[in-house]
């Protein structure tokens, strides 16, 4: 049982934010095993052109994972293929997760800007 526990990646997400911020992220918390597939959703209501996914690992600086501008990927800082973004429109940016590793346990944050 101890091995199974070690093989799980725990993803913590930013808590519920007031709607007046204009950016929401769901789900609030996510715990998944290495074989599960899940998605994180970022939605902005500010009319911004750019959206971002960040990763904050314990005792490490904030890491920029993906940048999308006008629904096109602008930057991908050598993120492993087990993280797959999807930007169906300028208001939504998904982060699809699969086959996660223990080192993927982190706080994942989304943001938007002009």
Swiss-Prot record:
Glycans are attached at residues 76, 89. GO terms for biological process: adaptive immune response; cell surface receptor signaling pathway. It is found in: Cell membrane. Disulfide bonds join 42-110. Residues 22-114 form the Ig-like domain. SMART domains: IGv (SM00406). GO terms for cellular component: plasma membrane; T cell receptor complex. PROSITE patterns: IG_LIKE. Keywords: Adaptive immunity, Cell membrane, Disulfide bond, Glycoprotein, Immunity, Immunoglobulin domain, Membrane, Receptor, Signal, T cell receptor. SUPFAM superfamilies: Immunoglobulin. Gene3D superfamilies: Immunoglobulins (2.60.40.10). Pfam families: V-set. Residues 1-21 form the signal peptide. Alpha-beta TR is a heterodimer composed of an alpha and beta chain; disulfide-linked. The alpha-beta TR is associated with the transmembrane signaling CD3 coreceptor proteins to form the TR-CD3 (TcR or TCR). The assembly of alpha-beta TR heterodimers with CD3 occurs in the endoplasmic reticulum where a single alpha-beta TR heterodimer associates with one CD3D-CD3E heterodimer, one CD3G-CD3E heterodimer and one CD247 homodimer forming a stable octameric structure. CD3D-CD3E and CD3G-CD3E heterodimers preferentially associate with TR alpha and TR beta chains, respectively. V region of the variable domain of T cell receptor (TR) beta chain that participates in the antigen recognition. Alpha-beta T cell receptors are antigen specific receptors which are essential to the immune response and are present on the cell surface of T lymphocytes. Recognize peptide-major histocompatibility (MH) (pMH) complexes that are displayed by antigen presenting cells (APC), a prerequisite for efficient T cell adaptive immunity against pathogens. This is T cell receptor beta variable 4-3. It comes from Homo sapiens (Human).
